[in-house]
Amino acid sequence: MMDEELSEYKQGRIERFVVWQKEHISDRQMTLILAFVIGLLASVADFFLHGIVHEIQLLLTSGFQQSSYNLLFLLFPIIGIYLTSLFIKYVVRDNISHGITRVLYAISTKNSRLKGHNCWSSVVASGITIGFGGSVGAEAPIVLTGSAIGSNLGQIFRMDKKTMILLVGCGASAAIAGVFKAPIAGLVFTLEVLMVDLSMASLLPILISCVTATCFTYIFMGDSSLFDFTLTNPWELNRTPACILLGIFCGLMSLYFMRTMSWCEGLFAKMKNHPYCKLVFGGLILSSLIFLLPSLYGEGYSAVNVLLKGQNEAEWGQVMNRSLFSGHQNLLILYIGLVTFTKVFATSATNGSGGCGGTFAPSLIIGGFAGFFFARLWNVYEVGVYVPEQNFTLMGMAGLITGVMHAPLTGIFLIAELTGGYQLFMPLMIVCISSLLTISIFESHSIYALRLAREGKLLTHHIDRAALTLMSMQSLVEKDYHPIKEDLPMEKLVSEISRSNNNFLPVLDEAGVLLGVIDITKIRHIIFRTELYKHFKVKQLMLQPSAVISENERMDEVMQKFDKTDAAQLPVVDINGVLKGYISRTKVYEVYRHIVADISAE
């Protein structure tokens, strides 16, 4: 009883504050204030997540010898995934996987509404997974967390649909800006990946969130960079062919990553009713890979740093420490290649068996190793002019981010801001463009948008498609119709027509299944001929509808049917053919115009 009273008291205080805000602070001003709060809270969430990961890893691996492998690598990931699955099953009780896809889905179909637990659940779950060695990234969970913070603040302050999308975008951009200390990358990530349109009205709140998150991350975590890089070999024009080829290689690696990830997800989906089988199967795959290739442990950023800081094979060879390859410098290229091509299996096994994490970091790691792999092979076999391995490691990361996310600006600015390698802008652009052109031949959507695009639930920059995505067919279905039976005499049909408010009457059987339709405009020439009343029944006068809409049909398909038939109304039926209502062309276009106006408004 006390808990209920306390909850009602808190709710009342919030309600009074919201009423006060509506009276004294404009929604525009409140949006800017919330943008600052979102940036602050996103940086706090990032700090806690990385704190959880660091403390768990320190606890588990502090006694390891850096030059030898350890059998505990076989055990840690399985323990972490098991603990994560227990946390999700008994505490969260909801699906929190595919963080960025979940944000896109909320924007497209749920009025940007995310559940309250998303403000913290992904932080804890992914912290446990990564800390115990799960081969996934923390970025997607943080993006989901930041977006959920923005969404829930928007719900509390009763913001309209467009402002809700903006606040979700603020949370996502703040998350990326805070994680990488890269405000511009956070801004363009929201534009390219979440596909939030940037007008002058929305630019300022997102910038505020990005800058706030970056500043507080510096306060919480210091000014150290995620990657240690010093440019010693500036870009030269004669390396352009190698950059183009690297971009093509990154595009193909992106395709490999996306297709393999999708295949692995399907494999684990077949075991959804056998959670312990998933845990054992995925855990064994992951732990075996980490045991053989320790660079797959956790996020893997430390391994990339070894490649960036090294100047020769002896220094680069440190990436093989704690593995069976340790001390065998001649196997470096083989080791790098194995990590490049097996990281996707480690990531899929982590998430598929019950872990929680994203594909952002794996994309960076695969890109870094792929870039080094390409450059090392190029130099060893003297394919052309010398290319610096460190530079190509960075460019590989940008290329994979571009290919996997279809986000060239994110790839360029993220790597430039992360490393301070602004002098590499030209080769970064060449690699990213080549990567995007290559992956676009095979996939038209990013790894996050692919699933939603197939279901027609993806909000894009294309205003027409975006409007159709935002339209809810259920809200368009009209129930105001006058049904009749097929054996009704024409004499009584005239009486039924006089009671109807529409130009049509659906003909139904006893179960409500649609048999046909009486179009009043088509029988007007005989309707007043009383001598025909006893000679005709409804089943002789009814017509088949020009098209029928399924109740789960996508709005773009509905619009195509209206265009093909030129009908004023079309019936909506369920899987058994039972009539659920009608959709009017006039109402569809009216709602469509309102949504387009909202999207286009500054």
State what each model feature region is.
Residues M1-L470, Q474-S475, K479-D480, I484-L505, ...:
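Alpha-helical transmembrane segments and immediately membrane-proximal extracytoplasmic
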Residues D480-I484, Q540, P545-V548:
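Structural signal for short hydrophobic segments within the conserved structured cores
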Residues P205, E478, H525-R529, L543, ...:
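Phosphate-coordinating loops and pocket residues in cytosolic domains that bind phosphorylated ligands
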Residues S209, V431, E478, I520, ...:
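ATP/adenylate-binding site constellation spanning eukaryotic-like Ser/Thr protein kinases
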Residues L515-I523, Y582-Y589:
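Short hydrophobic beta-strand motif reused across regulatory alpha/beta modules
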Residues I484-N501, L508, I527-T530, K534, ...:
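The conserved cystathionine-beta-synthase
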